[in-house]
A protein has these predicted regions:
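Amphipathic regulatory helices of Ca2+-sensor modules
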Residues: 313-315, 341-358, 380-393
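Predominantly late transmembrane helices and immediately cytosolic-facing juxtamembrane segments
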Residues: 278, 282, 465-502, 572-603
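Primarily EF-hand calcium-binding motifs
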Residues: 323-339, 361-382
Length: 715
């Protein structure tokens, strides 16, 4: 589906001309990396495909490498995830040692082989592997790379957040389940399970808080991904704890078996629901950005439809202007044969000598054609002068037009798009409701399961009270920032002329949105089919006789739970996620559409409620938006700043020591050998007198020495 979306997105933007072949090659390799990792039958193959995805993410995030921000984001993602990968490699090495040189799943997950392993050593190995998952899935404290990864094309963002990369870390942790569920490790790995849940809870709240103040549409979704993945980590932590502390194998333990299977299944079901919803949200956001960008382009470029000048000509014109050199002077300097005309070779050498470009012949041809006005295959002075003058005038005009850079991703440049992009608005509404955990939609069933299972563990182990409170608080926070995003984009009046001229999306983009919207709305069907019952050895014991039985079972546990604590908990979570968070957003953002603008019938209740609440309360959040907390959240809680400072101090201190070692030890050794060689050669050179008598004497002495050595050996 994302590939289909990419065709409509990438092929209609002129900026991607002559580079789409590279995009699709890297894109398909990225997908292959994740597929290979899931199909791998050993941790070794998992690691190989894991690294392949790391390479592809670097290439795709930095796809527009000519932009400094994209190049920086690619390096940042690559290096940050490499930190986690170092720990993963050490953990795998420990696992390889513990299991006598085996990393195959069939061997390491065998109960008899697990029984031979020291529990403390296995806990350390799995803990180090978990750090690798933290880096890959952008969890605290290795989370800083994910927001910057939005520099890549939107299809890449959709793929990273929905189907690959960040999900790889979750898959790795889920793959550890047999270790935690082994009877031979009973009660030995509960501390690691708590750490997994605590990291997840911390990241869930932190990322949701930062999403509150984001104005970039894709970055809101990036922090949403970080937060929702943290939910899954928390759910996995709770499930792994239950698997490690409950006797759930064999006859007589059916209840415990059901608890473990459903806890593990809820986390994986949320991974599925999140993938569907987030893939749809990123594709919908890409459609919005695509159309906003095109609307801005048409508004500001309708008055000059000329093709942009080749960048080499722009650089040449700028070069001559800085050198204060006329076209005639430049022409004379490169007309090597004084023919009064410049051929392709002379022009190519001129660009090379000016350090502008060293182009192959096939790229020189369109450049020559841009200057060669009479079409004779050569350039004369008037043609060059006229072309360079035109290029400078275009640059000056473009600079005047773009003295304020327009940001097509900023929600501050959107608003009121529900009437202009109804299909996209519908997809984003359904996806947002799923992420929020709105009743009966996909994400509701899995998120409620994660919250319930985390609290189930918290009642048994007080340490889990922290992640349990985090996921409950995160439910309300998710409701706020997802509602804020939709309202700022689709409700209210257009924020500027560009938003007022946005048009609908093309078919290539609409089709995946239709399909993913349907799947997301089908969450109740999937839940009724037993999608939460994923675990080894489950064998369908908890699956229901019919779809109706499954539906009634899920509805009863969600809204009429027999346990009074979980009955109250489900409604508290629902109150925070579906009422408090969205209600606060409705009172602060959006509003009614402009007069004359109409929305689809299914939007009418949402927009009417938004207009009524905002019109009644008129809350002003300007003071809060300028507070110290808001500033800190806008700066990502200064993690990047502190990391940069720490790295600078560590790297700078290390570099000085390395420089001393380099100059004193490495260079010193080489220079000592060099000096010794020079001194020895000087002394040997003194023996070269040019006298035949001296040479005969040295030959005789050498012969006697050799004779003496041979005589000694023989004797």
């Amino acid at each position: 589906l994302i590939n289909s979306f990419a065709i409509g997105y990438m092929n209609t933007d002129p900026i991607n001309d002559n580079r789409n072949h590279r995009f699709y090659a890297e894109f398909v390799l990225f997908c292959s990396g994740m597929l290979g990792m899931v199909l791998a039958d050993s941790f070794l193959w998992l690691f190989i495909f894991w690294e392949l995805m790391g390479l592809c993410s670097y290439l795709l995030i930095g796809f527009y490498y000519e932009r400094p921000s994209a190049a920086y984001a690619a390096k940042k993602a690559f290096l940050t995830t490499r930190v986690g990968d170092v720990f993963l490699m050490v953990g795998l090495a420990m696992l390889w040692t513990l299991f006598d040189g085996h990393l195959d799943y069939a061997y390491v997950f065998n109960d008899d082989n697990i029984a031979k392993v020291d529990p403390a050593s296995l806990a350390w190995a799995l803990g180090l592997m978990f750090i690798g998952a933290v880096g890959k899935s952008a969890q605290f404290p290795l989370h800083v790379w994910l927001p910057d990864a939005m520099e890549g094309p939107t299809p890449v963002s959709a793929l990273i957040h929905a189907a690959t990369m960040v999900n790889a870390g979750l898959y790795l942790v889920a793959r550890m389940f047999p270790f935690f569920g082994s009877e031979h490790m009973f009660g030995q790995l509960d501390d690691l399970a708590f750490i997994i849940a605590a990291i997840g809870g911390t990241t869930a709240v932190m990322a949701a808080a930062i999403a509150f103040v984001q104005t970039d549409l894709k970055k809101v979704l990036a922090y949403s991904t970080m937060s929702q993945l943290a939910y899954i980590f928390t759910g996995l932590g709770a499930a792994l704890y239950l698997a490690n502390t409950l006797h759930w194998h064999g006859a007589g333990h059916e209840v415990e078996h059901g608890i473990v299977v459903v806890a593990f299944g809820a986390a994986l079901f949320h991974l599925f629901n999140h993938a569907m919803a987030k893939g749809m949200l990123f594709m919908a956001s890409g459609a919005v950005i695509h159309e906003v960008h095109h609307a801005h382009h048409h508004l500001h470029h309708d008055d000059h439809h000329h093709e942009p000048s080749p960048k080499e000509l722009v650089m040449l014109a700028t070069y001559l202007k800085e050198k204060d050199q006329s076209a005639f002077e430049f022409f004379t300097s490169i007309d090597l044969d004084d023919s009064g005309e410049i051929d392709t070779y002379e022009f190519k050498e001129a660009l090379k000598s000016a350090e502008i470009a060293d182009l192959p012949p096939w790229e020189m041809e369109p450049l020559m054609n841009a200057i060669d006005l009479d079409g004779n295959g050569k350039i004369n002075v008037p043609e060059l002068d006229l072309t360079l003058t035109r290029v400078l005038l275009e640059e000056a005009h473009d600079h005047d037009d773009h003295h304020e850079e327009f940001d097509a991703q900023s929600m501050d440049n959107m608003g009121g798009l529900a009437s202009k992009m109804p299909i996209t608005a519908t997809a984003m509404l359904v996806g947002s409701l799923s992420i929020m955990g709105f009743p009966l939609i996909g994400g509701f069933w899995s998120k409620e399961g994660i919250i319930a299972n985390t609290w189930r563990v918290a009642l048994d182990d007080p340490r889990f009270m922290y992640p349990a409170l985090c996921v409950l608080l995160g439910a309300g926070m998710t409701g706020f920032y997802m509602s804020r995003m939709w309202l700022k984009t689709f409700a209210g009046s257009p924020k500027g002329e560009v938003a007022a001229h946005v048009g609908p999306t093309n078919t290539w983009i609409k089709t995946p949105l239709f399909i993913l919207t349907f799947i997301t709305l089908s969450g109740i069907i999937l839940a009724s089919m037993g999608f939460t019952h994923w675990a080894p050895e489950s064998k369908g014991e908890l699956l229901h006789d019919s779809l109706l039985d499954g539906f009634l079972y899920e509805m009863e546990h969600a809204f009429a739970n027999h346990d009074s604590f979980f009955f109250i908990l489900s409604y508290v979570a629902l109150f925070f996620g579906a009422i408090v968070g969205p209600g606060l957003a409705l009172s602060l953002y959006g509003g009614k559409l402009d007069d004359g603008e109409t929305a689809k019938p299914w939007f009418t209740p949402v927009l009417a409620l938004n207009a009524a609440i905002k019109g009644r309360y008129h809350w002003d959040n300007s003071a809060l938006s300028e507070s110290t907390l808001a500033t800190a959240l806008s700066n990502r809680l200064y993690f990047d700043h502190y990391y940069d400072m720490a790295m600078l101090k560590i790297v700078a201190a290390f570099s000085f020591k390395a420089a001393e070692a380099d100059s004193g030890v490495i260079d010193g050794t080489i220079k000592t050998i060099e000096r010794t060689s020079q001194q020895l050669s000087t002394k040997l050179r003194a023996l070269t007198t040019g006298s035949a008598r001296d040479y005969i004497l040295m030959a005789a002495i050498g012969t006697l020495v050799l004779f003496g050595l041979i005589w000694g050996v023989v004797a």
